[in-house]
Amino acid sequence: MAQFWAEGSLEKNNALVEYLKQYGVVRTDKVAEVMETIDRALFVPEGFTPYTDSPMPIGYNATISAPHMHATCLELLKDYLQPGMHALDVGSGSGYLTACFAMMVGPEGRAVGIEHIPELVVASTENVERSAAAALMKDGSLSFHVSDGRLGWPDAAPYDAIHVGAAAPEIPRPLLEQLKPGGRMVIPVGTYSQDLQVIDKSADGSTSVRNDASVRYVPLTSRSAQLQDS
């Protein structure tokens, strides 16, 4: 997916959401509302233009995804982010999408972010504390954990929604096992050439897979491999 407009052309979060609506990436009021509520600028490091439709580096060879990719994933998962549901964000990075999930599932649900770089967990916690999702982290319905995302987070499983923010060569089995029957996972799969795959698990535990788009994500890998060139 290519970016939709030139760098530096937008200065407000609401303007970003409006552009995403105009280009058909944000298609529902539910996704528009949460993206308007969680200001992307709070999750992008200083010195970068937060409302540009481009991924941004957040340190440690990690990025915050482009806004159109956040919108795409939220639209794909919105029916699995109803109040009271459980959501897992693998490779939570800046914490932006985990905060969006938390706002959608609400205080009766659970939104869990998994990140294997401890410094990013600290940063994402600080980001959320400045955002509209701060109260949800305080009451425990939103949490971040230092762990290998490929292993998921069994403590809050099963999950209605699982999002993976880095590309895996194949779908990690622990994530499939932690996906609730009737739930959905969105994950980029591949090495250089990647597809954003949508995995739906039926009530009997069988799964169906479809490709939604060709994408380019950083790899889902070990902490040591990620930090090797940082």
Swiss-Prot record:
Which keywords accompany this UniProt record? Cytoplasm, Methyltransferase, S-adenosyl-L-methionine, Transferase
Q: What do we know about how this protein assembles, alone or with others?
A: Monomer.
Entry GO MF terms: protein-L-isoaspartate (D-aspartate) O-methyltransferase activity
Q: What is this protein called?
A: Protein-L-isoaspartate O-methyltransferase
- Does the UniProt entry include the keyword Transferase? yes
SS bonds (residue pairs): none
Q: What is its EC number?
A: 2.1.1.77
What the record says about family reads: Belongs to the methyltransferase superfamily. L-isoaspartyl/D-aspartyl protein methyltransferase family.
Query: Is S-adenosyl-L-methionine among the key words of this record?
Result: yes
Q: Species name for this entry? A: Triticum aestivum (Wheat)
Gene Ontology biological process: methylation; protein modification process
Protein role: Catalyzes the methyl esterification of L-isoaspartyl residues in peptides and proteins that result from spontaneous decomposition of normal L-aspartyl and L-asparaginyl residues. It plays a role in the repair and/or degradation of damaged proteins. This enzyme does not act on D-aspartyl residues.
Q: What is its main location?
A: cytoplasm
Taxonomic lineage is: Eukaryota, Viridiplantae, Streptophyta, Embryophyta, Tracheophyta
Localisation: Cytoplasm
Q: Which GO terms describe its cellular component?
A: cytoplasm
